[in-house]
Amino acid sequence: QELSSSDKYRLVIGNICNLELVDKLIVDCDAVVNFAAESHVDRSIANAKPFLESNIDGVFSLLECVKKYEKKFLQISTDEVFGSLEKDSATEIFPFNPSSPYAATKASAEMLVNSYHITYGCDTIITRCTNNYGPRQFPEKLIPKVILLAEQNKKIPVYGSGKNLRDWIFVDDHCKAIHSVLKNGKSGQSYNISSNNEIDNVTIIKKILSIMGKSNNLIEFVEDRPGHDFRYSMNSNKLRNELGWIPKINFDEGIKNTIDWYLSNPQWRKDLSDQTFQHTPWT
């Protein structure tokens, strides 16, 4: 809504696999930043086909047009391409070890992007980020799902022991990192984006419940999902040292802001179905 009145903003609803549409849109732009993706791991386990279509075929469509019109291209990727790490944090040169169909499609997209840089000389950059949270996140993701279920005093499903570790970053910090890379990043390079804020799932859930004044009895441990990675962690020293980026929002501040936003914007979720909150779509 804030952008809708700007002559620099235009919303086009379409599919990145539509090469004809993508061609028309890219011809007049300065750069392409590809956020478009199927991203929910649970759904990739239930049906991987939409993930292959969006995350690989869609990237191919974008790259073909980027090559044709010689545009700058930034691919948004994920820490999940590195798989689960028992210790240490993945640098940009760590080997890929994706565990889920989702992660495999994102790793495939990265290799496709790199191939267009090497083979055709395309101006490409890749960023990988850890778990995002903040306002307007789709409620199939952990943090908004917990907030919305807790608000209704409904049970909150937690996979396995709930001790899986993720590094959490507030969405504003992620966006600022992307902007920094788009402006000053080196062509052909990749940059990890992380906040060094590892927290296990059940600790996050209990923190949210505490802030909302809800009981931990809402937590319901359920069967773990297939191939559930235990720990993701990335080293973002390259981004910090070369481009001077640092995250600004700590988790306590960010999670309170996030809870406040969801509770203050009930109209945003009025059309959500109960299916959004199902926890085992592969069964």
Predicted region positions:
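Proline-centered turn/helix-capping motifs that create local helix->coil transitions or kinks
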Residues: 74, 83-86, 121, 137, ...
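Structural element of the ATP-grasp superfamily
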Residues: 62, 113, 146, 239-240
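The catalytic Tyr-centered alpha-helix of NAD(P)H-dependent dehydrogenases
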Residues: 94, 98-105, 135, 139-143, ...
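N-terminal Rossmann-like NAD(P)+-binding domain of SDR-like oxidoreductases, especially those catalyzing
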Residues: 1-132, 257, 262-265, 274-283
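Residue-level recognition of oxygen-bearing side chains
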Residues: 21, 31, 50, 57, ...
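Short, glycine/charged-enriched secondary-structure capping and boundary segments
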Residues: 1-2, 25-27, 46-50, 87-91, ...
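Hydrophobic alpha-helix immediately C-terminal to the catalytic Tyr-X-X-X-Lys motif of short-chain
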Residues: 108, 112, 116, 146, ...
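C-terminal substrate-binding subdomain of Rossmann-fold SDR/epimerase-dehydratase oxidoreductases
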Residues: 10, 14, 144, 150-283
